[in-house]
Amino acid sequence: MPQVDPELFDRGQFQAELALKASPIAAFKKAIRMAGEVLDKRFREGREIRRLIEDRAWFVDNILQQAWNQFDWGNPDGIALVAVGGYGRGELHPYSDIDLLILLDAAEHEQYRDAIERFLTLLWDIGLEVGQSVRTVDECAEQARADLTVITNLMESRTIAGPEPLRQRMLDATSTAHMWPSKEFFLAKRAELKARHHKYNDTEYNLEPNVKGGPGGLRDIQTVLWVARRQYGTLNLHALAGEDFLLESENELLASSQAFLWRVRYALHMLAGRAEDRLLFDHQRSIATLLGFNDENPKRAIEQFMQQYYRVVMSISQLCDLIIQHFEEVILADDDSGTTQPLNARFRLHDGYIEAVHPNVFRRTPFAMLEIFVLMAQHPEIKGVRADTVRLLREHRHLIDDKFRNDIRNTSLFIELFKCEIGIHRNLRRMNRYGILGRYLPEFGLIVGQMQHDLFHIYTVDAHTLNLIKHLRKLQYTPVSEKFPLASKLMGRLPKPELIYLAGLYHDIGKGRQGDHSELGAVDAHAFCARHQLPAWDSRLIVWLVLNHLVMSTTAQRKDLSDPQVINDFALHVGDETRLDYLYVLTVADINATNPSLWNSWRASLLRQLYTETKRALRRGLENPLDREEQIRQTQSAALDILVREGTDPDDVEQLWSQLGDDYFLKHNAADVAWHSDAILQQPADSGPLVLIKETTQREFEGGTQIFIYAPDQHDFFAVTVAAMAQLNLNIHDARIITSSSQFTLDTYIVLDNDGGSIGDNPQRVKQIRDGLTEALRTPEDYPAIIQRRVPRQLKHFDFPPQVTILNDAQRPVTILEITAPDRPGLLARIGRIFLEFDISLQNAKIATLGERVEDVFFITDADNQPLSDPQLCSRLQEAIIQQLQAGQASEASPSRMTF
């Protein structure tokens, strides 16, 4: 800390100002304000961050000393003002806690009561928010013995005012000789660290990470130092290196990483104007700019900043894990040296952990850097890697060069890992954590810590990739196999499961580069297969899966699966059942590894439908596709059988069906046709809208809730319906719009509740939905087309211009309207309003929300049920939609939209 810094605090000038004023408050406030401005200015100028936070602590020391000296403390040897916690370390960020201990010599402190109260009142009046406790030395010992937080705070203390011997007595009373011996303290701190990490989902890669408390954050470094302090009396990284627990290179890496996080935290406090340790979307762009991350594309600048952030916290996490494991081996070691068991000439087991038999193993036999992970997969009883061996791995990973990568021993070992029955994901994670995977596969190293600035991808690319492999592995075990029965069944019968793991490893490896990441990844995958001398069939399948890993989900979400041509085109693209099986399993794992909230019953049913229909097409033969007329005949025949068995007059059925048109029978299966027909025929004339609600299935993973509406057609039907569903908190995922020749509309919506589940067998909820829709459709003129609702905080930070594409379908008499836009409440209702204004008829819709963006597809016609053929009309429609959506983006209190 500085001894003198007159720009920050001039003691003589301050005391002169105090002498001129009747009240000291104004002088204190002025000094605090000016010091804050000076320090913030220095931060923006790029001053060294450690100096800044120490300077702030030094300034607060001076202010507290001046405040303390305003009062008569009587016997000054019996009371001291002590800084504890982070302030005790001499580290203060703009809004850090200023934790104070007023330490007393004896319990009889009545003589100090008035001065203490007035001192604390003065601190409050001058705007210095402190956390304070008033304790005797004995009380400190009593509370520290019972509370881990108290002993931790007291270990980091400095005397600000009063006698230093008093603090030394407190330190003696709370030393390991009296409480919290190093072993007990270590166990408690290790448990505390694990619980804290679990609070943040045990990952460094949260979208809005906590700089202080999250895994790899500042608290991890502090935990290491607390344990070292209790064991060795060491309180800084440099001293820890002197105890041989840190190499000098590791000390430098930890120090630079800590400095980076300090700068981020300082900027957070400065921008938020309060104590804020969460790196919220609200601040990421401003901090990226403040720290010098610049790019023509602001989104890219944020991604660059966050990638450095994630790499820093990963480095901290790795090193702190290493040090804590080293502590564990030293502090918890028994008197004997532990049991050892040889594994081979290079490795042995030591108390269940694998270790190198000598320090030169990796230098003499570099292939052992891959062998160690294969051994752990082959021996699942191995608990992990000894700390010294982890350090050896880190020290020798520079030996992984092109010669190493092309050595057949190494390529064989890497492929062998993927053929192990268990431990693939666990050991790939270890390889990534120790920096081996990114060295062996440089293309993988590029995606480490790479985050995409959106709400759709909640993990970095490397974490998502390893999560995908984890999900593939879990498909073989209950209860995951029960949740994903088809994927689990297919996974169990894949001829070579190692190929899907390798495809998963490469599927997103092209992210972050210019160009289509699927194409880039396919090129990398081809090179990988060649280098590892995989058979031609294996290589072709891996490359094809990487190139096409998005095709199945895109088809299921954006195409009309009721159209036989869509199924036939997809079957032609896939080519055979083996590829279909691999692609389906990879798609399910990819979605669940991207964002667990993306997987819902409706998405599951779409993929399963596409898989089943494609499999039928492949077995039927691609040269014999099912045509529309054949599908309609099959549906009508099966539905009529159901109705006749239930006693329905076939003549009545034929009369009704004659009004419906071909599209209706293409878009619905026989069971739904029978269900609709029976209800319509029983509906009394002029009884108002018919609203039917049923589950698509009884099993949770099988689909959503189907709402069928039959009513006289009216121009604002779609707009009113979607607005009503918004008010009922329903999320629309699919819409099928049919208008009969008798001008009745037969609309089917697949919906889920806000939590992503189907409505279930809740009679009250079903009645609420039926009554709400019936009332809205009976009196549409009284129903608001748009319902006001605020935009969620996170969505506000992801803004981009809406994209609207209009094109005619060469194979069907419809126009396809594709909309990509920021997710905002009221989007569907706004689109419905545009359709009303342009006299547009909606035939079908596919609704999808991917994080903060919507990707909706509408199949539309003009009022005569013909595709839109006027280019000027299409241009005006496109412009109107964009203007309407931009108006929705500009509004803080935006209307409600059905989200996905």
From Swiss-Prot:
It catalyses: [protein-PII]-L-tyrosine + UTP = [protein-PII]-uridylyl-L-tyrosine + diphosphate; [protein-PII]-uridylyl-L-tyrosine + H2O = [protein-PII]-L-tyrosine + UMP + H(+). Residues 706-784, 816-900 form the ACT domain. This is Bifunctional uridylyltransferase/uridylyl-removing enzyme. Residues 1-342 are annotated as: Uridylyltransferase. Residues 461-583 form the HD domain. SMART domains: HDc. Pfam families: ACT, GlnD_UR_UTase, HD, NTP_transf_2. CDD domains: ACT_ACR-UUR-like_2 (cd04899), ACT_UUR-like_1 (cd04900), HDc (cd00077), NT_GlnE_GlnD_like (cd05401). PROSITE patterns: ACT, HD. Belongs to the GlnD family. The keyword Hydrolase applies. Residues 343-705 are annotated as: Uridylyl-removing. Gene3D superfamilies: Beta Polymerase, domain 2, cca-adding enzyme, domain 2, Nucleotidyltransferases domain 2. One of its GO terms (biological process) is regulation of nitrogen utilization. Uridylyltransferase (UTase) activity is inhibited by glutamine, while glutamine activates uridylyl-removing (UR) activity. Its EC number is 2.7.7.59, 3.1.4.-. The lineage of its organism: Bacteria, Pseudomonadati, Pseudomonadota, Gammaproteobacteria, Pseudomonadales. Keywords: Hydrolase, Magnesium, Multifunctional enzyme, Nucleotidyltransferase, Repeat, Transferase. Modifies, by uridylylation and deuridylylation, the PII regulatory proteins (GlnB and homologs), in response to the nitrogen status of the cell that GlnD senses through the glutamine level. Under low glutamine levels, catalyzes the conversion of the PII proteins and UTP to PII-UMP and PPi, while under higher glutamine levels, GlnD hydrolyzes PII-UMP to PII and UMP (deuridylylation). Thus, controls uridylylation state and activity of the PII proteins, and plays an important role in the regulation of nitrogen assimilation and metabolism. One of its GO terms (molecular function) is [protein-PII] uridylyltransferase activity. Its cofactor is Mg(2+). Disulfide bonds: none annotated. InterPro entries: ACT-like_dom_sf (IPR045865), ACT_dom (IPR002912), HD/PDEase_dom (IPR003607), HD_domain (IPR006674), NT_sf (IPR043519), PII_UdlTrfase/GS_AdlTrfase (IPR013546), Polymerase_NTP_transf_dom (IPR002934), UTase/UR (IPR010043).
